[in-house]
A protein has these predicted regions:
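Conserved catalytic/acceptor-binding region of the Class I
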Residues: 128-159
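A short SAM/SAH-binding and catalytic strip from SAM-dependent methyltransferases
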Residues: 104-117
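A short glycine-rich, Lys/Arg-flanked "PGG" loop and its adjoining helix->strand segment in the class I
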Residues: 118-129
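Class I SAM-dependent methyltransferase SAM/SAH-binding core
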Residues: 42, 48-94
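Nucleotide donor/acceptor-binding cores
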Residues: 38-39, 100
Length: 159
């Protein structure tokens, strides 16, 4: 199995247990990048959409590219009726965006799954002049009070 799809096999658990990002992070990004109506945004690998709502709610022209079929199904149920929402269920590495360019490309703990030359080379090509790449990462070592649970969590990460 492609290691990039490990969480797509457990989308409900991923959505339930995944650590969420702070609202302050998105407030800063929205303000700093000037995200709003008329701004073209691409999210790399949105998963279940934990970093989608604050950006999508600005009214920007939002596109997501998600490799996982299960994640894509969840995303379409959540956002498919939104006028400013576009989902591409494909591999960012090989997807042809044609002439489309973006003001902002962002990745919430996804870009590290891509080879560096592609991650940075392709995003640079897809950005409009003066565009911005924003990368968000989660940092920490979750320690459960239950050693058995912690061991089981580590098994998932080791896959």
């Amino acid at each position: 199995m492609d290691h990039r799809l490990c969480f797509d096999s457990i989308p409900d658990q991923f959505d339930k247990w995944r650590i969420h990002y702070s609202s302050e992070l998105f407030e800063y990004l929205i303000r700093y990048a000037g995200i709003g109506e008329g701004v073209k945004v691409l999210e790399l690998g949105p998963g279940t959409g934990q970093a989608t709502d604050p950006i999508l709610d600005t009214g920007c022209d939002y596109t997501a590219i998600e490799l996982g079929k299960n994640f894509s199904d969840i995303l379409m149920k959540k956002y498919g009726t939104r006028d400013n929402y576009n989902l591409i269920n494909d591999d960012f590495i090989i997807h042809d965006f044609g002439d489309e360019r973006f003001d902002l490309i962002y990745s919430a703990a996804t870009i590290q799954w891509l080879p560096e030359k592609i991650a940075f080379g392709k995003t640079f090509e897809l950005l409009k002049s003066g565009g911005m790449l924003a990368m968000m990462f989660l940092h920490g070592d979750y320690q459960s009070a239950d050693p058995e649970l912690y061991a089981d969590i580590q098994k998932v990460y080791d896959k």
